[in-house]
């Protein structure tokens, strides 16, 4: 669902943080889980469509901006990429890495290197053009200018063995014939899943919150909920998206989410800052790609489970979209596992933590809105949740400050000129553009007080205009996914699902306290 997501760096960091916390409290000692994971007048006019995003202007039009030689450097061969790799993973971290270079070059567009790189990943070219403001970042989604072939996590691509030897839809450019088949198939299964989506979500949320309540009653320090949340997400998505209910397989029901955790982690280790003791992390985790055989057994179990229990969806892929059985199952596993399960596993703890840790009165405002809209017998459904402006704004603001996809990539189809807010630069054919979303979404030219969490930022007419510049789904929030672009097929389902989770929370509870890893207390609705 979070198509083209590369949310995993935050996913692994979150798991590591939660695991440390749980170990220190002796809550889950036996869990050896590797993963943890302007005012209206001042705004530029919105982009007219998702395929012509570069026409948006937040400064003078390109013809009036100065042409500037692109700053930055790749450094000496081997030495430059290695130095940048150590800064990125060790000495600075991703935020400071990009921010310090932007300040040094006095530009939001510059050349640099990004991991993975030398010594044992010699086939990966670490050279990138960093784009760190909303205006230049939008070029990543202009499919006339850029190619999305095999750039999910930059120039590095995990072995195709992780996907049964198939280039699944996320690795295909829009010009490749199979992209239209895979994207259309994904959009159709999402459309069909809407019939059971709400029912399965609410059913699994009931189980999740009952587990949290039980754990809180047994532990004065609260309940670590990430594992329960992942189990909830896995069961919900498997049933809603593929029709394969994990309850038919005891092994999958108990361990399916763990299998996905390992499959996800092993693919992206070379690109991910985890935060363990250096230089051990650099030596053992960032120096080479890990082989598929480490998770081959688990992946085969997941493949067999989908193949045996998702018959209707598999027939749909074959009869209506011309996909082979293998292509259908591997694409389903990627959409469900990498995009949806992985994305929600990162985003939902951020959302729950933001609400549970708030002391500004936000919970009372959310509770009031939810109960007002759901009152008078209306209940909670897609229609009523769409009327909850504050709830939706909180979802959008969390996505802005904590995008589950930190990095977005695209390769220049030909030479072209790229505009930031204050200059124009020349990009050469074949160069890899890289946008670091946590900085892009803090663009002060677009967002007032960009570092602050403002729950009602996207409320009202002025707030709705800002949705043109909210990029988390491989395109703007106002964009429309289609076979001609790479925008997340489930862009709208993601945000409405998150809103449903908030609404369900405040129908169940008057108040909760906690953070992104644990719930301390819950006060049941009165």
Task: Name every feature range the model reports, one short phrase each.
Residues 34-35, 39-163:
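N-terminal membrane-proximal hinge/A-helix region immediately C-terminal to the signal-anchor transmembrane segment
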Residues 61-69, 74, 112-115, 148-205, ...:
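Cytochrome P450
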Residues 1-16, 39-48:
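N-terminal chloroplast transit peptides
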Residues 458-508:
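Cytochrome P450 heme-thiolate "Cys pocket" and heme-binding signature region
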Residues 343-367, 492-507:
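Cytochrome P450 catalytic-core helices
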Residues 86-99, 103, 110, 371-425, ...:
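Conserved cytochrome P450 K-helix E-x-x-R motif and the immediately C-terminal K′/meander segment
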Residues 435-467, 472:
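Conserved cytochrome P450 K-helix/beta-meander segment immediately N-terminal to the heme-binding cysteine loop
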């Amino acid at each position: 669902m979070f198509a083209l997501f590369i949310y995993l760096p935050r996913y692994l960091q979150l798991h590591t943080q939660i695991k440390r916390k749980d170990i220190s409290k002796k809550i889950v000692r036996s869990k050896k889980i590797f993963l943890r994971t302007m005012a209206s007048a001042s705004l530029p006019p919105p982009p007219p469509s998702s395929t012509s995003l570069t026409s948006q202007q937040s400064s003078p039009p390109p013809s009036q901006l100065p042409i500037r030689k692109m700053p930055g450097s790749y450094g000496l061969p081997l030495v430059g990429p290695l130095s940048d790799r150590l800064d990125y993973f060790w000495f600075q971290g991703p935020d400071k890495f990009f921010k310090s270079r932007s300040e040094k070059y006095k530009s939001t567009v510059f050349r640099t290197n990004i991991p993975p790189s030398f010594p044992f990943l010699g086939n990966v070219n670490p050279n990138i053009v960093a784009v760190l403001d909303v205006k230049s970042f939008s070029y990543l989604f202009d499919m006339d200018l850029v190619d999305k072939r095999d750039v999910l996590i930059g120039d590095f691509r995990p072995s195709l063995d992780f996907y049964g030897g198939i280039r699944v839809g996320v690795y295909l450019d829009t010009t490749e014939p199979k992209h239209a088949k895979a994207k259309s198939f994904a959009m159709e299964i999402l459309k069909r899943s809407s019939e059971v989506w709400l029912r399965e979500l609410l059913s699994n949320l009931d189980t999740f919150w009952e587990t949290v309540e039980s754990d809180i009653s047994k532990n004065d320090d609260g309940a670590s909920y990430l594992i329960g949340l992942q189990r909830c997400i896995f069961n919900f998505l498997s049933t809603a998206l593929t029709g394969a209910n994990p309850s038919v397989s005891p092994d999958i029901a108990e361990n399916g989410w763990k299998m996905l955790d390992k499959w996800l982690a092993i693919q992206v280790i070379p690109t991910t800052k985890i935060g363990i003791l250096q230089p051990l992390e650099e030596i053992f985790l960032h120096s080479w790609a890990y082989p598929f055989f480490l998770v081959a057994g688990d992946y085969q179990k997941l493949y067999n489970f989908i193949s045996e229990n998702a018959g209707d969806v598999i027939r749909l892929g074959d009869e209506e979209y011309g996909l082979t059985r293998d292509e259908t199952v591997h694409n389903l596993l990627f959409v469900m596992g990498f995009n949806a399960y992985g994305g929600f596993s990162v985003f939902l703890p951020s959302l729950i933590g933001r609400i549970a840790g708030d002391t500004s009165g936000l919970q009372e405002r959310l509770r009031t809105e939810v109960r007002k809209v759901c009152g008078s017998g209306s209940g909670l459904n897609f229609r009523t949740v769409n009327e909850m402006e504050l709830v939706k704004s909180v979802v959008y603001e969390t996505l802005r400050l904590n995008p589950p996809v930190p990095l977005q990539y695209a390769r220049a189809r030909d030479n072209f000129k790229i505009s930031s807010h204050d200059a124009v630069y020349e990009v050469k054919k074949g160069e890899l553009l890289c946008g670091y979303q946590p900085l892009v979404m803090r663009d002060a030219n677009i967002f007032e007080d960009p570092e602050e969490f403002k729950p009602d930022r996207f409320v009202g007419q002025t707030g709705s205009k800002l949705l043109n510049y909210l990029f988390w789904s491989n395109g703007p929030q106002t964009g429309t996914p289609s076979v001609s672009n790479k925008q997340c097929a489930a862009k709208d389902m993601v945000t409405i699902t998150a809103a449903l989770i908030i609404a369900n929370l405040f129908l169940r509870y008057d108040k909760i306290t906690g953070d992104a890893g644990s719930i301390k207390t819950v006060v049941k609705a009165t």
